[in-house]
Amino acid sequence: MACGATLKRTLDFDPLLSPASPKRRRCAPLSAPTSAAASPLSAAAATAASFSAAAASPQKYLRMEPSPFGDVSSRLTTEQILYNIKQEYKRMQKRRHLETSFQQTDPCCTSDAQPHAFLLSGPASPGTSSAASSPLKKEQPLFTLRQVGMICERLLKEREEKVREEYEEILNTKLAEQYDAFVKFTHDQIMRRYGEQPASYVS
């Protein structure tokens, strides 16, 4: 019987030593109403904390968020700009060559255009005719290729800065709209859940 008593005691005391003891289960209903009463307050506190966090200015988010233009380098290098200018100059020369060859192969158009030019400008002297044809042969460029490349590069940089400013302005506007909508939504949720309940002064 003593052995049976000791075995029975060990079996009876095992639930007391375990984390989920029967005594705690009996005390659980007594503490349930307090936890149920505290749950709306904790939810209200959490919602108020989220509302206060949302009350920050959207400019803080903009300062934390890196700009999408930060890692983007210039799309065209100086060598690429010069290469594009050379190709465009070659295309212009081909276009002029085609125009002059078309005028030479179509004499009817030139013969029809000569009387009108004669009536408008009068008889031309030999010096003026040679001077008029000389710019096609002896055309002096106003800028060198390097200067044209520098001008194009500066224009591209100015255009890039303008696009960046427009993008930042549009982004600020959209973020401000989202911020206002989020604040209004949070305020409506708080008023819908806890607007009818009396104010609580729980510290």
Swiss-Prot record:
Post-translational modification: Polyubiquitinated. Polyubiquitination is dependent of UBR5 that extends pre-ubiquitinated AKIRIN2.
UniProt-listed GO biological process terms: adaptive immune response; cerebral cortex development; defense response to bacterium; embryo development ending in birth or egg hatching; innate immune response; nuclear protein quality control by the ubiquitin-proteasome system; positive regulation of adaptive immune response; positive regulation of B cell activation
Keyword Ubl conjugation: yes
Expressing tissues: Widely expressed with the highest expression in peripheral blood leukocytes.
PTM sites of type Phosphoserine: S18, S21, S57
GO MF: enzyme binding; identical protein binding; protein-macromolecule adaptor activity; transcription coregulator activity
Record's keyword annotation contains Phosphoprotein: yes
Keywords tagged on the record: Adaptive immunity, Cytoplasm, Developmental protein, Immunity, Innate immunity, Membrane, Nucleus, Phosphoprotein, Protein transport, Repressor, Transcription, Transcription regulation, Transport, Ubl conjugation
Location within or outside the cell: Nucleus; Cytoplasm; Membrane
Residue ranges of the motif SYVS motif: 200-203
Positions occupied by motif Nuclear localization signal: 22-27
GO CC terms in record: chromatin; cytoplasm; membrane; nucleoplasm; nucleus; transcription repressor complex
Reported function: Molecular adapter that acts as a bridge between a variety of multiprotein complexes, and which is involved in embryonic development, immunity, myogenesis and brain development. Plays a key role in nuclear protein degradation by promoting import of proteasomes into the nucleus: directly binds to fully assembled 20S proteasomes at one end and to nuclear import receptor IPO9 at the other end, bridging them together and mediating the import of pre-assembled proteasome complexes through the nuclear pore.
UniProt miscellaneous comment: 'Akiraka ni suru' means 'making things clear' in Japanese. The name is given based on the presence of the clear nuclear localization signal.
Subunit field text: Homodimer. Interacts with IPO9; the interaction is direct. Associates (via SYVS motif) with 20S and 26S proteasomes. Interacts with SMARCD1; promoting SWI/SNF complex recruitment. Interacts with NFKBIZ. Interacts with YWHAB.
Family: Belongs to the akirin family.
Protein name: Akirin-2
Lineage: Eukaryota, Metazoa, Chordata, Craniata, Vertebrata
